């Protein structure tokens, strides 16, 4: 299959889908959805006390457990990304305080009311239709110059995936 994607600005982009492409819906979520044992990705701003203040929290589908596990710089200046398993969660003055663990360590994350919380749910190719908001995490340039991807995120319930 092939998709023609209209970008906000710039030329349309054609992307081929691998035979085993994974499609994930991106849906609204809340703090109540952050359960102990959930695998999450948190884009955050480091705080002076060493904790991380969440900007965005993505709750992964169980089939995505382990994706990008660890702690590293994120795509915004001065920010970090932590993909890890929720160990504990406690209500705090500034929001929910969540401790996450990954293979090389753990982080304390503060999730305030201003954090965007979304969840991935398993989807299928039928969701890839004209007008759908999508995000492609990674596309490979093929020898003939075309792009190919094995994963697409598609917004549901008004969500525009990033």
Where are the regions a protein language model picked out?
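Short, flexible, surface-exposed loop segments at domain boundaries
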Residues: 1-162
């Amino acid at each position: 299959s092939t998709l023609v994607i209209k970008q906000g600005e710039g030329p349309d982009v054609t992307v081929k889908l691998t035979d085993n492409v994974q499609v994930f819906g991106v849906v609204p979520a809340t703090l109540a959805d952050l359960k102990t044992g959930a695998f999450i990705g948190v884009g955050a701003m480091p705080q002076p006390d060493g904790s991380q203040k969440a900007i965005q929290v993505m709750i992964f589908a169980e089939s995505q457990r382990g994706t990008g596990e660890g702690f590293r710089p994120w795509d915004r200046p001065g920010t970090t990304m932590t993909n890890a398993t929720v160990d504990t969660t406690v209500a705090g003055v500034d929001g929910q305080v969540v401790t996450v663990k990954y293979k090389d360590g753990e982080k304390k994350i503060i999730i305030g009311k201003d954090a965007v919380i979304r969840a991935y749910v398993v989807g299928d190719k039928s969701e890839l239709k004209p007008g759908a908001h999508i995000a492609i995490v990674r596309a490979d340039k093929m020898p003939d110059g075309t792009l190919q991807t094995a994963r697409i995120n598609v917004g549901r319930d008004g969500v525009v995936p990033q």
